[in-house]
Every structure is written in structure tokens, then in C-alpha cells.
From Swiss-Prot:
Belongs to the YciB family. The keyword Methyltransferase does not apply. PANTHER family: INNER MEMBRANE-SPANNING PROTEIN YCIB, INTRACELLULAR SEPTATION PROTEIN A-RELATED. The gene is yciB. GO terms for cellular component: plasma membrane. The lineage of its organism: Bacteria, Pseudomonadati, Pseudomonadota, Alphaproteobacteria, Rickettsiales. NCBIfam families: ispZ, PRK00259.1-1. It holds the Pfam family IspA. The chain crosses the membrane at residues 25-45, 49-69, 76-96, 118-138, 150-170. Keywords: Cell inner membrane, Cell membrane, Membrane, Transmembrane, Transmembrane helix. HAMAP family: YciB. This is Inner membrane-spanning protein YciB. It is a multi-pass membrane protein.
Amino acid sequence: MLKLLSEIGPVIAFFAGFFYGGGIQNATLYMLITSIICITLCYIIDKKVSKLSIISSTVLFISGIITLISGDSMYIKIKPTILYVIFGIIFLMSGIKKNPFIKYALESIVRLKEESWIILSYRTAAFFFFMAVVNEVVWRNFSDETWVKFKVFGVIPITFIFILLQLPLLLKNKLPDSKI
């Protein structure tokens, strides 16, 4: 639950900051503060922070600080694209190398045949590359307000749909001692 809150909390803070706090600059500041709090809480409670969270936070801090200093919202808008491309490369390369990164993230929930982890890695890579393109299209062609709404009401449902579409693979290829 804490991990979910640490991922969603900064997005909610960004959304609230944009609509109730006065635009992208304030939203970026709120998101940075919330992210610092969430990472700190995760570390205090779990004594660790995941590699993906470290990558996400690093890109967020760099793009967020540049946005705040420069006053140019482009930097916070390209943050998702940068993250999606990085994650896409990680999942693609781990599939190619037959050492699927996604296995380490999900193995405590589901145990799969090795070839299924590789398929899931490729699918996840494709999903992240797709999301990078979608983010670029939305931020470059629509208003700030539309982009912010898309971040909450578009990305989350699209991600949920992607996860649901993976269920047949997971259920068909799970090992007998799997939790799902």
C-alpha cells in the first residue's frame, strides 16, 4: 500500500497543485515535496527504495528543478517521456538478455515460467515506448490543462488496461505455487 501511495501521491499533488495552487510551477513544487516525503517514508518503513523509484525520482528532481528555475514547463512535461524511454530500454534489454527485470518486480506476487517473464518484458517495453509517444503527442499538441488531466485521467486508466490485458498470459503461465 505504501508503494502505491508513493507512486500516486506525487501525481495527486501535481494535479491538486495545478488546479488549486496556481499552475505548473506550483504543481511541480508540490510534486517535488510530496515525492521527497514519499521516498523518505518508504526508506524509513521498508529500509529500501526500489531501483525504479530511484530512477523516477532522479528524473523528477532534475526536470522539476529545471522547470522551477527556468519557468519553462517543457522540462516537467518531457519527464514522463524520458522515464518511459528509460523503462522501455530497461525492459527491452532485460528481455533480450534473458534476465527479465520485471521478474524481480513481480516475483513476490506471481511465479511464471521463464519464457513468460521474457514475453512480459517485451510487452512492458512496448507499453512504455507507446506511452512515451503518447505523452509527446499530448504535451506538444494540447493545453497545459489537458496534459495535466491526461496525466491523471488518461495514464492511470491506460496503465490499468495494459495490466488487465496481461492477465491471460499470467494466468495461463503461472506456476502452481503462485499467489494469483
